Design a protein with these regions (language model features):
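Alpha-helical transmembrane segments and their helix-entry boundary regions
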Residues: 40-43, 54, 69-70, 97-101, ...
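Helix-loop-helix junctions within the multi-pass membrane cores of secondary transporters/permeases
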Residues: 71-163
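Helix-loop-helix hairpins and the membrane-proximal interhelical loops
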Residues: 1-49, 56-73
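Juxtamembrane membrane-interface segments at transmembrane alpha-helix termini
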Residues: 52-59, 81-88, 174-180, 206-207, ...
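Membrane-embedded alpha-helical modules
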Residues: 126-216, 223, 227
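Intrinsically disordered, low-complexity non-transmembrane regions of multi-pass membrane transporters
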Residues: 1-9, 123, 184-185, 230-231
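A cytosolic-side transmembrane-helix exit/cap motif
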Residues: 60-64, 89-97, 116-123, 180-188, ...
Length: 231
């Protein structure tokens, strides 16, 4: 079978790109009173993190110090270290620069698309991953810039429900992956792992921040998966 390349990666990321445009518009509209389209564009190019950018806008709105903004972004994006670490195992024989560029543009959604592709093939072409990442990256950039530009024209953007787009996209990706995983992993094992992640997340919320709770709950879920595989 012919190995999938850059444009197949772009095609695989189309659902993610559509979701990014929608939530990017929402982010831009919400941020329009506090940042210009140019500033939002630079934020999207160099930060490129939906939840972190929403947090940045909220902190900018209350004139929080730069150190507080930087620390918040770091904690929110901490989980991406874990995702990049795992994704890099699929590109062991790829050059360092390929891995750096792929990890720099990796998000929850592009990682999810990669995991879906891994179900169908044992080897993923690095160019496929670049296509997956770049389509999502450009879509997010365009969505946020256009949203900021149009922000002043929409006095009540909440009525469009754009803030739910990211949640809907996550649900769609998870549902698709869960259906695929059922064919390879016993349902009992899947529910045990999901239960560990869910329970540990809510327990951890009582002692650490939400970002750290996500990270630690994910690690506990991975640990449980390893334990179950060893049985």
């Amino acid at each position: 079978m012919k190995e999938k390349g850059f444009w197949e990666g772009v095609q695989a990321a189309v659902p993610t790109a559509l979701g990014y445009i929608s939530i990017g518009l929402a982010c831009g509209i919400i941020g329009s009173p506090y940042v210009t389209p140019v500033e939002m564009g630079l934020m999207s190019l160099f930060v490129y993190a939906g939840s972190a950018q929403f947090a940045m806008i909220a902190l900018i709105a209350v004139q929080a110090p730069v150190a507080a903004i930087a620390m918040t972004v770091f904690l929110i994006n901490l989980r991406l270290f874990l995702l990049s670490l795992h994704a890099s195992t699929y590109f062991r024989h790829t050059s360092l620069w390929h891995n750096i560029s792929m990890s720099s543009l990796l998000t929850d959604e592009t990682y999810g698309v990669l995991m879906g592709e891994r179900v169908h093939t044992d080897k993923v072409n690095p160019m496929w991953m670049h296509g997956n990442n770049l389509n999502s990256y450009i879509s997010w950039f365009l969505g946020t810039v256009v949203g900021t530009t149009l922000g002043g024209l929409l006095p009540n953007p909440e009525v469009f429900g754009l803030d739910f787009a990211l949640v809907g996209m996550f649900i769609g990706i998870f549902t698709s992956q869960f259906q695929i995983m059922q064919k390879r992993i016993p349902l009992r094992k899947l529910f045990i792992i999901l239960g560990v992640v869910a329970v540990s997340f809510f327990v951890l919320l009582t002692v650490v921040s939400q970002s750290l709770a996500v990270l630690f709950a994910t690690l506990l879920g991975c640990t449980m998966g390893v334990i179950l595989d060893g049985q």
